[in-house]
Amino acid sequence: MTTVHSIADPCDPEVSPTNNRHLTVSYASRYPDYTRIPALTMKGQWLEAAGFATGTEVDVRVMNGCIVLTAQQPQPEESELMQSLRQACKLSARKQKQVQAFISVMAGSK
């Protein structure tokens, strides 16, 4: 007879079978020699529901017999001031000192 500690607890799978998709590897031909290149095509509203809206950048990890797609979070938009400072970093040392002096004057005049 088994003890309480040796009975496996039921668990839910990480991915529901209703969320699984079945794809077939097709091919795309490459000009000029029309070489067949393996290709996967994915489309459907389920992509957006899964976090892959149009324009989403995707990280692709490839392993033997396995491809993992991960939607990347959009980077927050950089402020106009930060963009200007990034451009100022590309200026000559003399011009950078002028920018620093200007910022010091502006910061001091509250």
UniProtKB/Swiss-Prot annotation:
Stored InterPro entries: SpoVT-AbrB_dom (IPR007159), Toxin_SymE-like (IPR014944), TypeI_TA_SymE (IPR020883)
The protein's name: Endoribonuclease SymE
Origin organism lineage: Bacteria, Pseudomonadati, Pseudomonadota, Gammaproteobacteria, Enterobacterales
Organism of derivation: Salmonella typhi
HAMAP family in the record: Endoribonucl_SymE
Location in or out of the cell: Cytoplasm
Keywords, in A-Z order: Cytoplasm, DNA-binding, Endonuclease, Hydrolase, Nuclease, RNA-binding
Domain SpoVT-AbrB: from-to ranges: 29-74
Annotated GO biological process: RNA metabolic process
